[in-house]
Amino acid sequence: MNLILFGPPAAGKGTQAKRLVEQRGFVQLSTGDMLRAARASGSELGQRVAKIMDEGGLVSDEIVIALIEEQLTVQAGAPGFIFDGFPRTIGQAEALDSLLESRESKVDLVIRMIVDDTRLLERVTKRFEEQGRADDNPATFSRRLERYYEDTAPLVPMYAERGVLVEIDGMGSIEAVSAEIDAALKQSA
């Protein structure tokens, strides 16, 4: 199964992905984690990624797709993949389709986590205070949210037309959101 967890920054995608990894053995492909690791490496690529992330921009499709392709190859025997933070653009969605088709696979389910902007800001402020993530400062978060609405939200109708989109209320407790995701997974199986 190939599952996309979709929603704005701080919607809880990473939290839910980690739970699915533990409970179902899926492999989480978090572009955010991959990009933060590249950033921390201090490599030339990492420095380019850091500059883009610090400005609240989106890393180029070329870089992100290369990271995803590498992980699909390394983890080829996995029972399923959770794409967390990817795709973010129509171009990335098309590239993901091509990558999966070349492996005789496809996107099986897209779960869109809906959280209002006020709650997102509360969550990201708390996360910034607790974890100090550079991309969670208020100014950067505001730019990330704008980019989400401009670049990523247009994916909703595309996946809805394919019949693979399920929208859930991401404002409940972690357990309540988990229950909604589990129900969506059962329906799509």
Swiss-Prot record:
Residues 126-136 are annotated as: LID. It catalyses: AMP + ATP = 2 ADP. AMP binds at residues 31, 36, 57-59, 85-88, 92, 133, 144. The keyword Kinase applies. Pathway: Purine metabolism; AMP biosynthesis via salvage pathway; AMP from ADP: step 1/1. Residues 30-59 are annotated as: NMP. It is found in: Cytoplasm. GO terms for molecular function: adenylate kinase activity; ATP binding. Its EC number is 2.7.4.3. Keywords: ATP-binding, Cytoplasm, Kinase, Nucleotide biosynthesis, Nucleotide-binding, Transferase. One of its GO terms (biological process) is AMP salvage. InterPro entries: Adenylat/UMP-CMP_kin, Adenylat_kinase_CS, P-loop_NTPase. PROSITE patterns: ADENYLATE_KINASE (PS00113). ATP binds at residues 10-15, 127, 172. GO terms for cellular component: cytoplasm. Catalyzes the reversible transfer of the terminal phosphate group between ATP and AMP. Plays an important role in cellular energy homeostasis and in adenine nucleotide metabolism. HAMAP family: Adenylate_kinase_Adk (MF_00235). Monomer. Belongs to the adenylate kinase family. This is Adenylate kinase. It comes from Hyphomonas neptunium (strain ATCC 15444).
